[in-house]
């Protein structure tokens, strides 16, 4: 979904949102129409805004593997019809030591102003993104298997983050019956949040990464801060990160949510 080495997010904007799921794949044949709770919403509860599509999400479904067929679309199906070339971020680097998968996995995270979901980067996209940020693969002992594991961990971190956001958003289920969707997100690895700095002063470690996720709550933009902490050894589900997810204190509503949850945790 994102494309930075730490835990990826790029918000390059574009206007082409014509990507469609791979043909013949049952998982993408149906499309949700409207709000599942209220099919003809009125008023602010299901208000929609128009958001531009991040470049790395364009044509993303062309690389999503169909679980029935077991293989991704290849060759001509993946070429840009305008120049018969694959998208640049799926092109192997000139000195790349081994081949990497271009298959992309669909997330469970709804994309704002769309019936589609966000799609995670492929191994090749992740590799290219790291190179672009100055990473030197020759300085690392890295293999194809390592890249596979990196993608699995990255995807699991994002799924875990969204689950935590949904817990907070449950406080607003009445005002937003359609549920939230993700507009954009970005990494701020070295911009430690006040909460992280206070924890550090108390003797705890600083997070190894930070993301800010901007969600659409039925017409209202809400920012969430996510601090990523090392949780030790990676388990079989590729989970090793401890996430501290909470709404940013950008509004009285967010302050009230934080106060309520803090009280519940204190008294439970």
Swiss-Prot record:
Keyword field contains Chloroplast:
no
Region: Disordered; residue ranges are: 1-25
Superkingdom is: Eukaryota
In this chain, composition skew of type Low complexity spans 1-22
GO cellular component labels: cytosol; membrane; mitochondrial inner membrane; mitochondrion
Q: Name one GO molecular function term.
A: heme binding
- Catalysed transformations (reactions): holo-[cytochrome c] = apo-[cytochrome c] + heme b
PROSITE patterns reported in the protein's UniProt record: CYTO_HEME_LYASE_1, CYTO_HEME_LYASE_2
Q: List the disulfide bonds.
A: none
* Principal location class: mitochondrion
As recorded in UniProt, coiled-coil segments are none
Pfam families in alphabetical order: Cyto_heme_lyase
Enzyme Commission no:
4.4.1.17
Q: Where in the cell is it found?
A: Mitochondrion inner membrane; Membrane
Topological type in the membrane? Lipid-anchor
What residues show lipidation of type N-myristoyl glycine?
2
- Pathology noted in the entry: Linear skin defects with multiple congenital anomalies 1: A disorder characterized by dermal, ocular, neurological and cardiac abnormalities. LSDMCA1 main features are unilateral or bilateral microphthalmia, linear skin defects in affected females, and in utero lethality for males. Skin defects are limited to the face and neck, consisting of areas of aplastic skin that heal with age to form hyperpigmented areas.
Q: Which PANTHER family match?
A: CYTOCHROME C1 HEME LYASE, HOLOCYTOCHROME C-TYPE SYNTHASE
Protein family membership = Belongs to the cytochrome c-type heme lyase family.
Provide the protein name: Holocytochrome c-type synthase
Organism in which the protein naturally occurs: Homo sapiens (Human)
Q: What is the lineage of its organism?
A: Eukaryota, Metazoa, Chordata, Craniata, Vertebrata
């Amino acid at each position: 979904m994102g494309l930075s080495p730490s835990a990826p997010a790029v918000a390059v904007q574009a206007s082409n949102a014509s990507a469609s799921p791979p043909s013949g794949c049952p998982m993408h044949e149906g499309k949700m129409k409207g709000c599942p709770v209220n099919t003809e919403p009125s008023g602010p509860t299901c208000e929609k805004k128009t958001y531009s599509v991040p470049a790395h999400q364009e044509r993303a479904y062309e690389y999503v593997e169909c679980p029935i067929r077991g293989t991704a679309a290849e060759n001509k199906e993946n070429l840009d019809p305008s120049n018969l070339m694959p998208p640049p971020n799926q092109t192997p680097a000139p000195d790349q030591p081994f081949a990497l998968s271009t298959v992309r996995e669909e997330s469970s995270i709804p994309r704002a102003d769309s019936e589609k979901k966000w799609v995670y980067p492929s191994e090749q996209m992740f590799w290219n993104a790291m190179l672009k940020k100055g990473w030197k693969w020759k300085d690392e002992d890295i293999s194809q298997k390592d890249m596979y594991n990196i993608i699995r961990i990255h995807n699991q971190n994002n799924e875990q983050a969204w689950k935590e956001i949904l817990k907070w958003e449950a406080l607003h289920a009445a005002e937003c019956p359609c549920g939230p969707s993700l507009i954009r997100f970005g990494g701020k690895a070295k911009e430690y949040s006040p909460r992280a700095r206070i924890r550090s002063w108390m003797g705890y470690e600083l997070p190894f990464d930070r993301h800010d996720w901007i969600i659409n709550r039925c017409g209202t933009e809400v920012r969430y801060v996510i601090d990523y902490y090392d949780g030790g050894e990676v388990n079989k589900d590729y989970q090793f990160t401890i996430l501290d997810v909470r709404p940013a204190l950008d509004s009285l509503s967010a302050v009230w949510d934080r106060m309520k949850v803090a009280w519940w945790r204190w008294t439970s």
